[in-house]
Amino acid sequence: MNTPDPWSSPEVQFCFAAANSSCPRKARPALVVCAMYLIMIGAIVMTMLGNMAVIISIAHFKQLHSPTNFLILSMATTDFLLSCVVMPFSMIRSIESCWYFGDLFCKVHSCCDIMLCTTSIFHLCFISVDRHYAVCDPLHYVTQITTRVVGVFLLISWSVPIFFAFGLVFSELNLIGAEDFVAAIDCTGLCVLIFNKLWGVLASFIAFFLPGTVMVGIYIHIFTVAQKHARQIGTGPRTKQALSESKMKATSKKESKATKTLSIVMGVFVLCWLPFFVLTITDPFIDFTTPEDLYNVFLWLGYFNSTFNPIIYGMFYPWFRKALRMIVTGTIFRSDSSTSSLHPAHP
């Protein structure tokens, strides 16, 4: 007697077997399904724990209560919410190719997806503004980047994506002109976010290309200024103080670390999000023929940016490494732990 291979593709199945209008469920070998669940659950857990560590560190330790760190705290909160509210449901949809949670929650999930991803990108943009003042105008940094200014940054970072996401999805402006395609694929268990040609371009511009261009421009300027400062130090007056060997080594190390950090920041950001937003623009122009699996790969690549954020903007800071050790070892539960000295106080 032949026994079915548990690792082979199953027969054609439907999301809701009892529904006549059910969407077909994508057939995948069980081994592939297991691998996808392991990878995506791992990404969700890493995103959740990494950003939770940043949130606890900044919220608990008083020495970290600075305007700059409030930006990082807010971004970590955004990425944490993404891992809790959006990614688990996207995981099931991506693997099972079915939506089991109803039409209303489909819209809410789509809104939260757009909102939180855009909010995270906006935070990255404003953090680049903060770093610009810190590196390019350090003498006036404290007076320029105040708690009030950061409050404005946070207000923009949250309010614009909220109004944009919920307004667009519930008004269905993104579907105008794509009604025939929507009707053709409509079935029970479907939850896809479709953009027409106009909103494919506008949404990508608002959520990625505008803040991304600002961010790239700022970091290029920061890099240029940092290199200029390094050359000025190297060609300055040959005084005993200016030519201090220890100072020159420290400066060289600092500039090298800054260059490395900026390269990683920009590389990860562009690598994670550029493919998805290019696809968002091009898909309506090729009659929505992008393969579903390719769309999911690019979507999750974008999600991974929220996984990497606490590593880039947290673990590169010595205060975070020390705070993380205190969290892991339980030292944080001491009554006086909130006043512990974490050096340096500012990133």
UniProtKB/Swiss-Prot annotation:
CDD domains: 7tmA_TAAR2_3_4
Resulting phenotype, residue 23 to S: Decreased trace-amine receptor activity
Disulfide topology: 23-187, 106-191
UniProt topological domain (Extracellular) ranges: 1-37, 91-110, 171-197, 282-296
Record note on what altering residue 117 to A does: Does not affect trace-amine receptor activity
Domain of life, source organism: Eukaryota
Keyword Transmembrane helix attached: yes
A molecular-function term among this protein's GO annotations: trace-amine receptor activity
Subcellular location: Cell membrane
Region of interest: Extracellular Loop 2 (ECL2): 175-188
SUPFAM superfamilies, sorted: Family A G protein-coupled receptor-like (SSF81321)
Record-linked InterPro entries: GPCR_Rhodpsn, GPCR_Rhodpsn_7TM, TAAR, TAAR_fam
Gene ablation phenotype (knockout): Mice lacking Taar4 show an absence of aversion to low concentrations of volatile amines and to the odor of predator urine. They display decreased sensitivity to 2-phenylethylamine.
Any one GO cellular component localisation term in the record: plasma membrane
Main location: membrane
Tissue note: Specifically expressed in neurons of the olfactory epithelium, to discrete glomeruli predominantly localized to a confined bulb region. Present in the dorsal area of the main olfactory epithelium.
GO biological process: behavioral fear response; chemosensory behavior; sensory perception of chemical stimulus
Membrane topology: Multi-pass membrane protein
Cytoplasmic face of the membrane: 59-69, 130-149, 219-260, 318-347
Transmembrane segments: 38-58, 70-90, 111-129, 150-170, 198-218, 261-281, 297-317
UniProt keyword Transcription regulation present: no
Keyword set, alphabetical order: Behavior, Cell membrane, Disulfide bond, G-protein coupled receptor, Glycoprotein, Membrane, Receptor, Transducer, Transmembrane, Transmembrane helix
Family: Belongs to the G-protein coupled receptor 1 family.
Job description of the protein: Olfactory receptor specific for 2-phenylethylamine, a trace amine present at high concentration in the urine of carnivore species, playing a key role in fear and avoidance responses. 2-phenylethylamine acts as a kairomone in the chemical detection of carnivore odor and triggers fear in mice. This receptor is probably mediated by the G(s)-class of G-proteins which activate adenylate cyclase.
Name the UniProt record assigns to this protein: Trace amine-associated receptor 4
Protein's organism: Mus musculus (Mouse)
